[in-house]
């Protein structure tokens, strides 16, 4: 039993060992399968910290890494899935496929052994032009074994149209098998042939110069014996000039790599869209042309400065002229446009590159293979874009260093200073353009994120939609907190634009105008910005129309200072509402675009005329220099074509100057006494109105004859062609002066043409209102009428179209004038209706006052008949105060009342009252009651008079007709009270 148990136990242990070994083998197989990815057989190794990952180009800091012994690739464990297929496995598969294809073709190979075998490059490479441009020197050597391939041209030459169908099918299968090559393999074979060869072909034009500038500095590039002969200042200056040329050469190399290697490979090998490639490399062709030309000029100047018999030793003494020509004029404008576009799209280009690199494996493989070489390792796409962006910022530093170490002539230093100023101006313009382009792109982004139905009501202006944003320029934007009337804070996006402040609020990933208690569009007209006391982040925005105050808060104190500064600057330069309306209709927008196009055409016309006059003057000066031996003529005034400057001449002054030049030219050609009164009807005979006779155009006032037989004889003909003044100084020849006057006349006439064009555009763009417009229309109509009275003449079709356009424009102007007159008539009719209503009210008030006056006169008449005044002695007669009499109606008393004037010789007031009533019966009755002036006596005991003397105030007329009505009852009570004591006394 023990033996049986031992055997059983041994057998059990044996089975367990086999099971454990099988499990270990399965684990090893699973681990091996897990390491096997994309044809790579990865194994685990331990590496140092200096080993770089092939996939991500980063150092492998972990203790373990993966390596493929087939292709010797070391990567991170996490990067194995991103690695491309193993190249050795691909080559084995490719050789097997080609061997199979060649075996199938051997049965139908009809090519003779004497015929040389050709390489079917069109069937192998998908882009023949790219291979020819980059690998022309290596065309005879193939990277793949094609010894058993067939020439399609030779095969086709041995088969006619009557060949069997089976042979043709075999031929098509063989050629299709060659065309089925993967595009990624084509890229690999391209780069495997050597990036050095590609680079050498790219820089073939500057190969010699690149070797000459391989040293780090000028001191190391020249011979030591030649270096010891130079001064220290010259050595420093030449080092900087050498650095300028060397960095320019490197910059051209970077541009060529971007243009010829990356862009061409992406277009022809990867078959990317042209728009995508243009987004990666914007304006590289323009930049390459600009800097290649500049580098050629620098290298030519270096060759001119070489010492005789040497190819290394040189000293450049003159460089400022090249710098001025490069950074001024058309060249500077080209650089400004190219760098503005490139730098503004720098961020988008890098973002697009990262997206392509992350999602496209073929793109990853292309970039890795290109940058594998040592010469291109530091020239990836991102590095090249960054280098091109930073290049323009290096010029001011280099030129400033050259200027600091220049101790030569003053002219060179002055030119270097000018060049430095031009470079700084160019850099400032590029920065401004980049800022504007970035703000424009930001505005487009905001516009596309806005809700199309979003509108903000503007008081008395209408709705403000998102289309109004595109009319303006975005100056500044940012997120702020808007404090509402309830004390809550709302997150808003504030846009500072040309003439408005716009508040936007984000809702459902779209921008809308916030529906709050205040308008979300604020005009910059008379806008006031104030800081909030005791708050570092708050500020007030006080608007005038409508009068509102906004309280907003920024993220920091610096942001508030920035907002205050930019808002105040925008308020100072805010355009008026006449030039830039708040809300623009479609018709107004169309007219504005037309005006802008007209202004651009005027600028282009002025520029063309300026260039034309300059060429004419240059040609004339060249002819004069040849004839007179180097005598240069003065140039035209600089402000002739400057329409924006204050030196811009007016059309009238230009015309007067042109007439003066014509008269001077006439005096030079035919003499000062000849009157050129030629008419187109009879140019030979001219009648002098003073003498009544005929005068020939060749006879002067002194009777001297002039002959014009195809040439010009000047009025002063001396035996000696040279003329001298009284002091013996040489005078200018008449021919030179005539040519100079001709140049002046030519420039003045073209300047007049430019001024007239600009004036027409200005008058059409800004039509005056009222009589000036009617006068303009009348002048236009009179010109048309005079042109019509000249007589019928054949009119060209383009002229008919022009006249039709003019008539249509005049018709539109007349219609606009008619509408304006109608609006004016409606306003006048409304005013007339208001005046008529006021007139009716005044007539009613006048009738009421007349009725009250009649009633008062009737009461006075009744009172006078019932109570006659008692007879008194002359000494007891007292003068009546104006208040004690029956007062007439309100208007009559107000117009006739004269306050009493104090007399100098008496202590009492002389109450002489003069009453002029508009009612004649009332005035007669008043005279009867008061009596004659001789019978009036002064009453010094009147208490009312005494009170008036004590008061000393002037009597003021009543304020309203109601006061007059209330005062009419006063005289009756006074007379009744005065009558009682009179009766008692009597």
Curated annotation (Swiss-Prot):
Q: Which residues carry this modification: N6-acetyllysine?
A: 354
Quote the InterPro entries the UniProt record gives: ARHGEF2_PH, C1-like_sf, DBL_dom_sf, DH_dom, PE/DAG-bd, PH-like_dom_sf, PH_16, PH_domain
Q: Where is this region: Interaction with DYNLT1?
A: 131-161
Just give the chief location class.
Answer: cytoplasm
Q: What is this protein called?
A: Rho guanine nucleotide exchange factor 2
Q: Which GO terms describe its biological process?
A: actin filament organization; asymmetric neuroblast division; cell morphogenesis; cellular hyperosmotic response; cellular response to muramyl dipeptide; cellular response to tumor necrosis factor; innate immune response; negative regulation of extrinsic apoptotic signaling pathway via death domain receptors
Organism of origin is Canis lupus familiaris (Dog)
Q: Where is the composition biased (Acidic residues)?
A: 941-950
- Give start-end ranges for the coiled-coil region(s): 591-612, 798-867
What do the Gene Ontology cellular component annotations say?
bicellular tight junction; cytoplasm; cytoplasmic vesicle; cytoskeleton; Golgi apparatus; microtubule; protein-containing complex; ruffle membrane
Residues annotated with Phosphoserine modification: 109, 122, 129, 133, 137, 143, 151, 163, 172, 174, 177, 645, 691, 696, 711, 782, 886, 896, 932, 940-941, 947, 956, 960
Q: Where are the zinc fingers (Phorbol-ester/DAG-type)?
A: 39-86
